[in-house]
């Protein structure tokens, strides 16, 4: 019986091998071809879906963009590790110095103002039209860069007490630059009023010369008017706000930013507040500015404006780009959504700028230092476990001759404590 079993098993094995070979020869080529086709089709679909999915979740622009203006927006949101560890909160900063045209948050504003003017027929590329603007520097740099890219000229008016490297850069970009003595907004020689008057004179002279057949000055003059132009806050409503919301997955407790024109704080607040009603919006205000009292007490006033004093600068601070002593349309657009304000002295801004270099390797501009100081104060007020977002508006490279000249060099062996920053005092 066992021998018969062995014979049976062996015969069955041989028969199986023969049948397998026969089946392979008869049917396998067709099956193999079908399998190859199936795999090819589904592999292609998987690759296409993966490509679409990966692009959908990327934080950043497409791999290839059209011109320098395509490099604006979609900036990273970085965690400032030292401040997060020191406060127990997550302090995040929008790296606006990575915008690709003028390397500041003003790239968004400049592009928005130009596009709105084009839509309204106020400017035409390559027609000789000139953009005029009154600015402390960053908006002018962004406008000058984009003007060249889009076929315009730029004429920038700025206070003469701003860092010289800003006007030098504007000249390298081909802009005409007027450095005018600081003056109140009510005076015609104020840098904003001068830009407005020059734009109007340009347009009027072009029209007059056209009627008599001369053309010494081509095109029209367009006054960008960043303080009152709604394209300012809309740039942040359409760009900065949605980016922050997406990068935070809709979860943040406070947004902190300085205000000069007011476009950033208003645009971001107008976008985020309806979606995150319980979040806090905080203005970071340098010394000499009246916005702190405007938010806290409803009155635009600073103690440095008391009767019998006359300040050399519009806002008595070494901080550039934020702080103001008048109401602007852009700030008023979102003022009711602003919950609080933090006053930051020059000494505190300088100490924070040095801290960011020492602890994080972040070389921040003056307004960015003010923002980060106010973010820390907000974090300490809210308590551990909260998420605060602020802005790194531009780098320190535009503040070398003034703000960073005062801040000095950061030594290699320095070990600053956060208390030193919070309690920083002016040198006597």
Swiss-Prot record:
It is a single-pass membrane protein. GO terms for biological process: cysteine biosynthetic process from serine. Its main location: mitochondrion. PANTHER family: CYSTATHIONINE BETA-SYNTHASE. One of its GO terms (cellular component) is cytoplasm. The chain crosses the membrane at residues 7-27. It is found in: Mitochondrion outer membrane. InterPro entries: Cys_Synth/Cystath_Beta-Synth, TrpB-like_PALP, TrpB-like_PALP_sf. GO terms for molecular function: cysteine synthase activity. Its cofactor is pyridoxal 5'-phosphate. It comes from Emericella nidulans (strain FGSC A4 / ATCC 38163 / CBS 112.46 / NRRL 194 / M139) (Aspergillus nidulans). Keywords: Membrane, Mitochondrion, Mitochondrion outer membrane, Pyridoxal phosphate, Transferase, Transmembrane, Transmembrane helix. Pyridoxal 5'-phosphate binds at residues 260-264, 367. Belongs to the cysteine synthase/cystathionine beta-synthase family. Signal peptide: none annotated. This is Cysteine synthase 2. The modification N6-(pyridoxal phosphate)lysine is found at residue 106. Pfam families: PALP. It catalyses: O-acetyl-L-serine + hydrogen sulfide = L-cysteine + acetate. Putative cysteine synthase that catalyzes the conversion of O-acetyl-L-serine (OAS) into cysteine, the last step in the cysteine biosynthesis pathway. However, in contrast to cysteine synthase cysB, this CS-like protein seems not to function in cysteine biosynthesis.
């Amino acid at each position: 019986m066992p021998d018969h079993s062995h014979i049976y098993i062996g015969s069955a094995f041989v028969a199986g091998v023969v049948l397998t070979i026969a089946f392979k020869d008869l049917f396998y080529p067709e099956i193999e071809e079908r399998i190859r086709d199936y795999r090819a089709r589904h592999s292609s679909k998987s690759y296409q879906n993966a490509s679409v999915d990966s692009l959908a979740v990327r934080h950043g622009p497409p791999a290839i963009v059209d011109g320098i203006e395509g490099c604006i927006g979609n900036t990273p949101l970085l965690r400032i590790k030292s401040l997060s560890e020191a406060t127990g909160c997550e302090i995040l900063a929008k790296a606006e110095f990575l915008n690709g045209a003028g390397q500041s948050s003003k790239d968004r504003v400049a592009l928005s103002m130009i596009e709105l003017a084009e839509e309204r027929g106020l400017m035409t590329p390559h027609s000789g039209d000139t953009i005029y603007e009154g600015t402390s520097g960053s908006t002018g740099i962004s406008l000058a860069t984009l003007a060249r890219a889009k076929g315009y000229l730029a004429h920038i008016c700025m206070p003469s007490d701003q860092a010289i490297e800003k006007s030098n850069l504007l000249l390298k970009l081909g802009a005409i630059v007027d450095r005018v003595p600081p003056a109140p907004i009510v005076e015609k020689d104020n840098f904003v009023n001068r830009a407005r008057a020059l734009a109007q004179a340009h347009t009027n002279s072009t029209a007059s010369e056209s009627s008599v057949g001369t053309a010494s000055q081509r095109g029209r003059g367009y006054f960008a008017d960043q303080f009152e132009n709604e394209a300012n806050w809309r740039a942040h409503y359409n760009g900065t706000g949605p980016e922050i919301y997406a990068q935070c997955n809709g979860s943040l407790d406070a947004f902190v930013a300085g205000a000069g024109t007011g476009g950033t704080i208003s645009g971001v607040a107008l976008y985020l507040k309806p979606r995150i009603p319980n979040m806090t919006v905080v203005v970071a205000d340098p010394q000499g500015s009246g916005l702190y009292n405007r938010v806290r007490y409803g009155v635009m006033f600073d103690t440095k404006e008391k009767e019998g004093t006359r300040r050399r600068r519009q806002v008595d601070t070494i901080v550039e780009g934020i702080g103001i002593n008048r109401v602007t349309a852009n700030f008023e657009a979102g003022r009711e959504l602003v919950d609080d304000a933090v006053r930051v002295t020059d000494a505190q801004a300088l100490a924070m700028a040095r801290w960011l270099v020492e602890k994080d390797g972040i070389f921040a501009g003056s307004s960015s230092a003010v923002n980060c100081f106010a973010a820390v104060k907000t974090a300490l007020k809210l308590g551990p476990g909260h998420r605060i977002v602020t802005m790194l508006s531009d780098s320190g490279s535009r503040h070398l001759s003034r703000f960073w000249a005062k801040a000095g060099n950061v030594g290699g062996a320095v070990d600053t404590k956060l208390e030193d920053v919070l309690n920083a005092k002016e040198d006597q």
